[in-house]
């Protein structure tokens, strides 16, 4: 049996090797290791010519700005490079033993770095107004915040009122406008709770005790179950005050209510529904708005600080280019620009409302006539009752570039794919902190990626492509900017980029195969479309990689099963004998999503703040 096992195991390894490396097949048909897409090479056809920026003709930026960019084409992928010929023009600048060819793969060296700025992906919900999820409480559907990233500097402004939204909601005989949005006082106190208080409260909870302060605050708010419904997945949002180190649970999930039909701005009418809106205000700089879904690794995957000496751009075949079509506003400083971006960012606020009796009118009538059914049928936020439940999924004008010299804020809704090194700019997002900045532009990114790609190709071609005279072939990637001009393998003398703190050089004499359209979309130029005709327009197919992974996994599983069967038969037999003794196995572990005690809401048998809804529909009395 052991011989059989060895034979099968060796066969499995050989099968795996054949799948991944092949026996004489064309190596360019297989993906790179640790890369989603293999970077094959096509015949080099890029003869030096006078450099032209491939941006749309309506682009108005100065040439020196464009030269500092590094952008990538995300939807143009490699094709076969069999029969690639060296470019004579490129050989002249290098030693006689080097033959330089240019890859046709338009990859993006910024992909990993820029992942956190793909807000639709990393946040996945509204920013200005976040109501991206629905949840049921006691048989009624509600909307609630669901963004996966913290929103720094976000708060709620109550119109024509000195009441802060972090004040507890009105209870008992208080007028509506005497209260804010936060949880009412409880015994023991659950909101606001200090950071040290939360640490102490969850010190024995392995899942929570070591979380950072923002994630801990989010989980603490999610510990409260509305309306004694332990099966509900409704979780309250929260705001963390970084200055006071306190976590405030928000009793009201609504973030916007404006217009005469829905609220009354008259301060004298204290018991009417108040108007409010989300904002990034000076007084909110220490606040961070949190949903129940904030990920515990947000520091790695979400943007926080603004990027100094940088502006967002689009990767366009080897260089990062300006985004040609933006909305430009005046802004005195970074804070004002960040505030403008936030105001235009993704929003889940409903766009349609009932034609007759509105939600807020129902609420007011319910209070006035003590009609509990009217209160129960209504629901914050505005328009959620018989109205559209619009979800932005994070799509909006979420990015901006602030020019410190011209005091202009350039806002756009296309996902940036790279950064331009420019000493005049600060790159910001709607999620980012309104004033915090970091200055650590990755100047060596291009050089490192160029060297990595050249080394990767060299390993693949090995000695097979060396000619009889011992000349060495170099496959240069399509990266035409670097802080090391020799690494560019440029057929002409690279030019230094102006306003660059990294001292970048750009190669302008290699023809670019992509350009930016009028809607900020990067596309392959018309004359090169035939070469990329068989390549998917937006994303590469990963069928081959999936087959390889699945086959390798199957072989590994087979080998593991054989090993277990041959060497642990006796141990397994003993375990099978115990199957009739369930008492020996103990209790099952609880689910992670039930890790917090639902009774920790501290309400006990006392009357809750609301018996009908997770948000303010009737005044609780204590």
Curated annotation (Swiss-Prot):
User: Where does the record say carbohydrate is attached?
Assistant: 162, 286, 371, 421-422, 499
A family per Pfam: AMA-1
Matching entries from SMART domains are given as: AMA-1 (SM00815)
Spell out where the chain crosses the membrane: 547-567
> Which Gene3D superfamilies does the entry link to?
6.10.250.430, Apical membrane antigen 1 (4.10.1010.10), Hepatocyte Growth Factor (3.50.4.10)
Give its localization: Membrane
The protein's name is Apical membrane antigen 1
Q: What is the organism field in this record?
A: Plasmodium falciparum (isolate Camp / Malaysia)
